């Protein structure tokens, strides 16, 4: 198959799956394994590296919030919200790193341990059930200023679990925030902004510990194919961020969250029965 077409396909898969409750890592892993024949560890590392496009999209879409964060970082902001968001991101990112790095090192050793690939489908299905239950029972009342240290730590732990293949980062962090009583629109927004430092850290860890796998993945898809996939992922991501946040502002948010929960459950079932993958 043409590498440019592969790049476009991977970019679309990454751009869509990052923001809805299906694991983008797992979807890219499945597609890249099917189209390129990559091994588990190489495909998994490639999936993390693909997040460059979604990081770019989040920075572009939330540029005002990023500007406020930078001002708060050097104590030049006059807005309390900027300092609260900075505190939130710092704590969440630290907890995510403490959870995520050991999990990542464990995951890339899975083929060595001989664990079956069916674990991906099981984890995805469990993730989907958690997402569905959390959205069914939430009471939306909180904003960023209402979150306590304990709440922020819980969000960090949830995001750290997303290092596991099959676990949706946006799905599990949004679910955690909604379970804590955060308003849906605020929960989506905080989850999406939290992606930026978490994904940057994930890419850094991937390059540090999996240089060979990343190099092999880039060679398999070609540098031009990789760049195309990142650009496509960026544009698709911007569209989906905007669509989800706009929908979350409406009184039809229950429809949105139920649909996202169903998508996660179906994704888990399909991954679990994809016999050609494992």
Curated annotation (Swiss-Prot):
Q: Which Pfam families match?
A: BacA (PF02673)
- Localisation: Cell membrane
Tell me which EC number(s) this protein carries: 3.6.1.27
What InterPro entries would the database entry show?
Answer: UppP
Molecular-function GO term, any one = undecaprenyl-diphosphatase activity
The UniProt entry lists membrane topology as:
Multi-pass membrane protein
Provide the alphabetized UniProt keywords. Answer: Cell membrane, Hydrolase, Membrane, Transmembrane, Transmembrane helix
Catalytic activity, reaction form = di-trans,octa-cis-undecaprenyl diphosphate + H2O = di-trans,octa-cis-undecaprenyl phosphate + phosphate + H(+)
Any stretches that span the bilayer, and where are they?
3-23, 42-62, 88-108, 112-132, 152-172, 190-210, 225-245, 253-273
The kind of enzyme this is, by top-level EC class, is hydrolase
Q: Name one GO cellular component term.
A: plasma membrane
> What PANTHER family does UniProt report for this protein, alphabetically?
UNDECAPRENYL-DIPHOSPHATASE
The family classification in the record reads: Belongs to the UppP family.
What the protein does comes down to: Catalyzes the dephosphorylation of undecaprenyl diphosphate (UPP).
Q: Which NCBIfam families match?
A: PRK00281.3-5 (NF001398)
The protein's name in its UniProt record: Undecaprenyl-diphosphatase
Question: What is the primary gene name for this protein?
Answer: uppP
């Amino acid at each position: 198959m043409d590498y440019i077409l592969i790049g476009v396909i991977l970019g679309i898969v990454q751009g869509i799956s990052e923001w809805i409750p299906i694991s983008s890592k797992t979807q890219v892993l499945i597609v890249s394994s099917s189209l390129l024949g990559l091994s588990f560890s190489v495909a998994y590392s490639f999936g993390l590296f693909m997040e460059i496009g979604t990081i770019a999209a989040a920075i572009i879409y939330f540029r005002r919030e990023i500007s406020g964060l930078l001002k708060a970082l050097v104590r030049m902001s006059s807005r309390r919200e900027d300092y609260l968001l900075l505190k939130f991101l710092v704590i969440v990112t630290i907890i995510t790193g403490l959870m995520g790095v050991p999990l990542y090192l464990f995951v890339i050793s899975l083929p060595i341990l001989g664990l079956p690939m069916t674990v991906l489908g099981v984890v995805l299905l469990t993730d989907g059930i958690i997402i569905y239950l959390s959205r069914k029972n939430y009471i939306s009342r909180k904003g960023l200023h209402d979150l306590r240290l304990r709440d922020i730590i819980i969000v960090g732990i949830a995001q750290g679990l997303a290092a596991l293949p099959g676990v949706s980062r946006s799905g599990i962090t949004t679910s955690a925030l909604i379970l804590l009583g955060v308003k849906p629109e605020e929960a989506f927004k905080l989850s999406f902004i939290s992606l930026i430092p978490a994904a940057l850290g994930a890419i850094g860890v991937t390059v540090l510990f999996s240089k060979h796998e990343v190099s092999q993945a880039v060679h398999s898809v070609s540098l031009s194919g990789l760049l195309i996939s990142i650009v496509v992922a960026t544009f698709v991501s911007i569209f989906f961020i905007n669509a989800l946040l706009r929908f979350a502002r409406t009184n039809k948010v229950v429809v949105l969250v139920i649909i996202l929960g169903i998508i996660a459950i179906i994704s888990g079932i399909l991954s679990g029965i994809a016999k050609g993958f494992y």
